[in-house]
């Protein structure tokens, strides 16, 4: 059941959860020094005054701290989650109770999800956003696809390829029936988007290469203080949290197959090994495969690993990396989950439509599929993000890194004029984000002397590494 206020001020699961949410937000603020320092730094300046920000990013306690930071800096904000299972209902309630429009609840249908995304793109007096905080690119996609449809209405006749596409097109049909130039007007006022995750960044670069990108974008994901912290250290803790909350399984002694060894895969593989699992990695990239092997992981193909694994984790950002055929070949009681952004890494639709499997829901976000052979598998979070679907996502401290980058990116886009392209935050800001988090960990930095800095050919105060340095 959802609760709706007049004029669509919010739609959340239960507004009475707001007090609980507020208590957890206050705890999270103590663990998010970067965001709180950014609030203090810009308190008198209000650098986002006049900005209308659409946020499509997991509606968690940590995100609530980001939202209130953007509001503190002067922005008008509307928010929805970027995943049907990732909302923490008490966090959404707290934000709604604070008077910030939010449209999010845990367990949305796909139709509800795209309805929520539409709501956050509709401000008062018919206006749209002029900035977007995106995670996975769905808010950006809705504008771009709507824009294409206005140029070629025949696209509305397209037969949807899947249930998600069907839900998205239904919303776009309704918008087009109300205003045939809605998305052109929205795009004309957009100053830019800052994108949180690898999948969304891929979408942006693809649009840029095709000449379809309508406004500037900042790739927050590839800031060092995001990708090397959130993706790596965040997953290192939250993957195990999701698996254990969902299944209570003992990880020690199990065989865990991690598909992909990018930053997310690295965090997952090291996490599972720390728990005592034997970890097998699959990879397409020879560099990542060599890294995994040099770290002591067995690297092989899914075809070779499928009969060995007790737990399978997809981390690739690609589609169909675990197929229906793979799942049919898995050991009895294997656990299958995904920590990449979208659910198409695992062939969930094919599994659900397969007549040779019987589905039994064990509890929310845990489903057992029994095949004709008698073997069963457990699918977590319906193939969506296991750490957010079955747990509460990354810890506050590491999200402070990511969200400080997001805040700085929004300030950059709002206060400066960027041409249409995909950018990264400058190295100085990356280092500043890191610096803001050192004090809480008791870190003391060594300071270069002028002579040492001159010897290295860098400023005393940094930046200390060239842009091509990989960390």
From Swiss-Prot:
InterPro entries: Adenosylhomocyst_ase-like_sf, Adenosylhomocysteinase-like, Ado_hCys_hydrolase_NAD-bd, NAD(P)-bd_dom_sf, S-Ado-L-homoCys_hydrolase_CS. One of its GO terms (molecular function) is adenosylhomocysteinase activity. Pathway: Amino-acid biosynthesis; L-homocysteine biosynthesis; L-homocysteine from S-adenosyl-L-homocysteine: step 1/1. The keyword Isomerase does not apply. The keyword Iron-sulfur does not apply. Its EC number is 3.13.2.1. Keywords: Cytoplasm, Hydrolase, NAD, One-carbon metabolism. GO terms for cellular component: cytosol. Binds 1 NAD(+) per subunit. It comes from the Bacteria. It catalyses: S-adenosyl-L-homocysteine + H2O = L-homocysteine + adenosine. GO terms for biological process: L-homocysteine biosynthetic process; one-carbon metabolic process; S-adenosylmethionine cycle. Its cofactor is NAD(+). Pfam families: AdoHcyase (PF05221), AdoHcyase_NAD (PF00670). Gene3D superfamilies: Adenosylhomocysteinase-like, NAD(P)-binding Rossmann-like Domain. Substrate binds at residues 60, 135, 196, 226, 230. NAD(+) binds at residues 197-199, 231, 260-265, 283, 318, 339-341, 387. Belongs to the adenosylhomocysteinase family. May play a key role in the regulation of the intracellular concentration of adenosylhomocysteine. This is Adenosylhomocysteinase. It comes from Chlorobium limicola (strain DSM 245 / NBRC 103803 / 6330). The gene is ahcY.
